[in-house]
């Protein structure tokens, strides 16, 4: 089945890479706020979920505009570059957020199903390639050029939509079960 899937580097299917790593309020002439736009970092992305919500910081409108020249949009894929490494999140919201420390945003070209690409990036095959391209001994990290060389395998767009739809339904069921367990 996968033998007829097309293999290509991630950069071939990516429209935009949003990489504002290293930016801080101080470097941009601002400060953290008590409210406003959430600033996600690598520590907030784990196993396809936003975690440690209590550690999320905020910036005001002015700092948001300075920081996020390219905004995260619904359908973008967030991926951590280090600490933790290779964690993914599919952004399925219209909320405007700031990409903070050690986090890339990927916008997939329209002729591909971004949700399918997200699920593909969660596969053992893709994660192993990420590990093979990583650098560092104490803290393992991934540079953007190496990420963009990683191979993606894609079937035709109709099959991408079908596969993504099945995994989305499974994720929704998992979330329902987790909520039920939390309320027991």
Q: Locations of the language-model features?
A:
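Short glycine-enriched loops at secondary-structure junctions
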Residues: 45-46, 83-85, 135-136
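Residues marking the start of alpha-helices
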Residues: 1, 28, 55, 63, ...
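A short glycine-rich beta-alpha junction/loop motif
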Residues: 81, 97-104, 115, 135-164
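Sequence-specific dsDNA recognition surfaces
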Residues: 7-30, 43-74
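Non-catalytic DNA-recognition/assembly elements of restriction-modification systems
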Residues: 1-23, 149-183
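A short beta-sheet element
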Residues: 41-42, 58-126, 143
